[in-house]
């Protein structure tokens, strides 16, 4: 289906805006995935704050040309599904990784984070990043553990001094 020039410009502008606002991007090949499965993926993506779109490769290359995601240009071959994480850097990677478990034909090609290219086998690094809330809770547990240890140490020192004085 032919797309006129105005529609192409609109697609490039839309994807470019999404890329500029994104924290990370993941590229996949969704050839052979059913429409209902793709609809489910798009629904999950909206809920996770991930922008997902199937875009022609030439338009995609133009859209990401002046962004940190231009490192992905070499993987824009065949049918390309791109996802931009807007809320959390690992959201798109986590979403695609979970989706790929149930879809044999869904293939994650690569990702980009902070201008760095991540091959398909490195997606786990991005997918396992803790969310903001998880990171805060991990930090709080470390702080709480250190404070508890300090309190126990001070109590032991006090008991030791009391025992020595008696």
Swiss-Prot record:
Alphabetized UniProt keyword annotations: Ribonucleoprotein, Ribosomal protein, RNA-binding, rRNA-binding
Classification via CDD domains: Ribosomal_L10 (cd05797)
One cellular component term from this protein's GO annotations in UniProt: large ribosomal subunit
PROSITE patterns: RIBOSOMAL_L10
Keyword Transferase among UniProt keywords: no
Alphabetical list of InterPro entries matching this protein: Ribosomal_uL10, Ribosomal_uL10-like_sf, Ribosomal_uL10_bac, Ribosomal_uL10_bac_type, Ribosomal_uL10_CS_bac
Single GO biological process annotation from the record: translation
Pfam families, per database record: Ribosomal_L10 (PF00466)
Domain of life, source organism: Bacteria
MF (Gene Ontology): large ribosomal subunit rRNA binding; structural constituent of ribosome
Family of this protein: Belongs to the universal ribosomal protein uL10 family.
Role, per record: Forms part of the ribosomal stalk, playing a central role in the interaction of the ribosome with GTP-bound translation factors.
Quaternary assembly: Part of the ribosomal stalk of the 50S ribosomal subunit. The N-terminus interacts with L11 and the large rRNA to form the base of the stalk. The C-terminus forms an elongated spine to which L12 dimers bind in a sequential fashion forming a multimeric L10(L12)X complex.
Name of the protein in question: Large ribosomal subunit protein uL10
Native organism: Pseudomonas fluorescens (strain SBW25)
């Amino acid at each position: 289906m032919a797309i006129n020039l105005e529609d192409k410009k609109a697609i490039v502008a839309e994807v470019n805006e999404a890329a500029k606002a994104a924290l990370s991007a993941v590229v996949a090949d969704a050839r052979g995935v059913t429409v209902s499965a793709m609809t489910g993926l798009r629904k999950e993506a909206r809920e996770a704050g991930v922008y997902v779109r199937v875009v022609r490769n030439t338009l995609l290359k133009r859209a990401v040309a002046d962004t940190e995601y231009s490192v992905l240009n070499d993987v824009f071959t065949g049918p390309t599904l791109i996802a931009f994480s807007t809320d959390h850097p690992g959201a798109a990677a986590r979403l695609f990784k979970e989706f790929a478990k149930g879809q044999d034909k869904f293939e994650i090609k690569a990702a980009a984070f902070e201008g760095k290219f991540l091959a398909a086998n490195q997606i786990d690094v991005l997918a396992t990043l803790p969310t903001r809330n998880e990171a805060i809770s991990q930090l709080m547990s470390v702080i709480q553990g250190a404070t508890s240890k300090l309190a126990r140490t001070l109590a032991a020192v006090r008991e030791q001094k009391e025992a020595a004085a008696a």
